[in-house]
Amino acid sequence: MTWKPKMLILSHDLISPEKYIMGEDDIVELLGKSSQVVTSSQTQTPSCDPPLILRGSGSGDGEGNGPLPQPPPPLYHQQSLFIQEDEMASWLHQPNRQDYLYSQLLYSGVASTHPQSLASLEPPPPPRAQYILAADRPTGHILAERRAENFMNISRQRGNIFLGGVEAVPSNSTLLSSATESIPATHGTESRATVTGGVSRTFAVPGLGPRGKAVAIETAGTQSWGLCKAETEPVQRQPATETDITDERKRKTREETNVENQGTEEARDSTSSKRSRAAIMHKLSERRRRQKINEMMKALQELLPRCTKTDRSSMLDDVIEYVKSLQSQIQMFSMGHVMIPPMMYAGNIQQQYMPHMAMGMNRPPAFIPFPRQAHMAEGVGPVDLFRENEETEQETMSLLLREDKRTKQKMFS
């Protein structure tokens, strides 16, 4: 491949930045030849176009009076898309000069908002010219640009887009790619590539194994997504990490704990039900016992004369006093007195029991027969009198014991 310097012959009064546009890396040599200024570019550029010769009115040739050739329009869609193989190779091996491509595809006000921690981005150089000649536009890049736009439109129409762990951005992003760029995808990692040439771009590829499902392309702080494989291919499941295993163990432990708690609650419910049943049985037995005690107290109240008290302690006091009075009567009978003096009874006993006894209920004999004296009895000596008193005392004691037994049986039955 041969490189030829581009010769531009200009008049001394036509050298201006509007007529001739020089790149940043161009080296121009000004030569004076027959009252004309000749500029020679020392940069290596492919010899795709013939040199542009502009003649002024001050030249000595006869063609100076002719009209100046107009520069071709800057629109690239009028350029022929058919090129030869050698020209294609020359464009592919040309240094990366793509400022014109990015200047027309991107808005001038778009600023990079994406964090630049993973890849270093070079600042974009200032624009070189206000318009670009059609001869300097490589046709290969135009084809790559159109392919990229078609790819972007197809990826936007897809509904099933896998984000791959990269944060989503607004959908109005611009996809920039070239025919020679390739995006590698590795298993479990995320690779990024930086391409410079007017606008910095970052390509983010989520790692999904050799058969990745989606590719994320970030451009000047924006992202666009595209499918790199058929949607029918199954997504490979990543192996479980230590965090997932720990979460699974914790979940199983919680389930086991919940089951144990349910069993404990059921046992508590059964225990509480048993306790409630035992309490109910105890209440029933206590009620029955109280009923029996009330019945015995009623029977004892019937035995005591003129007993109008319902309190248990007072009723028991009356019973004790009544038994004592009976014992005193038995002692007097045994002594053989003619009649029991009223002074021997207590005041309350005499008031309570004596009138009641005189009405006929449990009525004792009106008087105790006075034993006759020995000299008055006919054929009866003092020994016989003592025996008679002893027998009377025994009968009285037996009666009292029987009555006491009956009272106790009624109280505890």
From Swiss-Prot:
GO biological process: regulation of DNA-templated transcription
InterPro entries per the UniProt record, alphabetical: bHLH_ALC-like_plant, bHLH_dom, HLH_DNA-bd_sf, PIF1-like_bHLH
Gene Ontology cellular component list: nucleus
Domain bHLH, chain residue ranges per copy: 277-326
Keywords: DNA-binding, Nucleus, Phosphoprotein, Transcription, Transcription regulation
Subunit structure: Homodimer.
Protein name: Transcription factor bHLH23
